[in-house]
Amino acid sequence: MRMYDIIAKKRDGGTLNHEELSFAVNGYVAGDVPDYQMSALLMAIYLRGMTDEETAMLTDVMAHSGDMVDLSAIAGIKADKHSTGGVGDKTTLVIAPIVAACGVKIAKMSGRGLGHTGGTIDKMEAVPGTRTSLTQEEFFRQVNEIGISVIGQSGKIAVADKKMYALRDVTATVGCIPLIASSIMSKKLAAGSDAILLDVTMGDGAFMKDLDGALELARQMVAIGTAHGRKVAALITDMDKPLGHNIGNALEVAESMAVLQGKGPTDLTEVCLQLAGNMLVLAGKGDMPTCRKLAESVIADGSAFEKCCQMFAAQGGDISVLRDADKFQKAKYSYELTAPADGYIYKNDVEKIGNASALLGAGRIKKEDSIDFAAGITMHKKLGDYVKAGESICTFYADDESLFAAAVEMYRGGLVIRDEPPTLPPLVYARVTSDGVERF
């Protein structure tokens, strides 16, 4: 078998089989297939597409290119959730404790942030002392004992994905739905959970900018998971405005704790209840109305918040900051961005908000950048809100005053104020399961 023939077959619109995909992917991981040939295959896939069966086979090969985590040592159904990313996307810190408090095991591996999108592991490490690297034995023991652990992704899972993504990033082949679906699902399958809920974000601050693309990505990922015997569903959620009011690691942890204590922003609370409810449905806890009520009840009785504190304590975190957000270390400097005129916030580009937060030190511009956990933005006025000239739109936080100018310029570049209000998008557009699409 030759890589040349595999490239030519896909270039001409052919369908690759498992053996060919395995030869290409495993050869690339081993160093036998050079970058230029894998680049050519990725571009051929980008231009020609893949059948659902091909995408499922590619995902399987990628998943098996590294360690496959066997969670059978953990009793009961294990549930996982993946978000395709966004700004102010702090839902994992809310829904994982909710679901665990309802008796479903959460053994989750999460990632770090890059560019305008934040990462769950960075947010967790904003809680002083929190360990996000556990041995497998520690991870399993914690989930068996308290029902929940969230740790950083192992570099040994879906090894092919890391190499292939780095290549896609520099060869203009990132925006290909079969390649996005196989990248995400290879890691989810390797991580071993029985039930997987996918949060496919859509809008300015998301990778998928339109509903058709988001639905197709969701459909393909659900099909992959179902083909591999997992219970999978996806929600298409809005990312035309950040969730909640805070962007930045410690700021987002504080806001997440407010939701778990029943006093969080309504948009973030609603999306989290929908996500948690759907995870509970996948885990066999009942239909959606039943599971929604279950999720609401563990917030109301405080058990979800206590479950979150239990998780952080087990991983070495100082939970006093969870109980009292004022105990988080604060940024040295703040800056108020005020409205230039009266009117409605008609547009507030979410990617620019995320990039402004990163410029303040809350995110990474490059992978090796360090993070200032206290830095970030608190939004006082969001998309659709009315504002008066001179009124504060948001507060910027940083440990270096010189960072404000570039961040303010970035934020202002995406801000439009008009006399008429915009049409606000729904929080959740649709649910995608193996049975089809349910639009809301």
Question: Over which residues does each language-model region extend?
Answer:
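Well-ordered secondary-structure scaffolds
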Residues: 5, 17, 68, 78, ...
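A glycine-rich helix N-cap at a beta->alpha junction
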Residues: 123-149, 219-225, 229
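Acidic, glycine/proline-rich low-complexity segments that act as flexible tails and inter-domain linkers
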Residues: 1-88, 259, 309-314, 318, ...
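Glycine/serine-rich anion-binding loops at beta->alpha junctions
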Residues: 77-100, 104-116
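Short acidic, glycine/serine/threonine-rich loops at helix termini
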Residues: 92, 110, 117-122, 154-155, ...
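Alpha-helix C-terminal capping segments
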Residues: 47, 93-107, 187-192, 227-228, ...
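General beta-strand structural signal in soluble alpha/beta enzymes
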Residues: 106-110, 132-135, 150-153, 197-200, ...
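Phosphate/diphosphate-binding glycine-rich loops and adjacent basic-rich segments that engage nucleotide
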Residues: 144-193
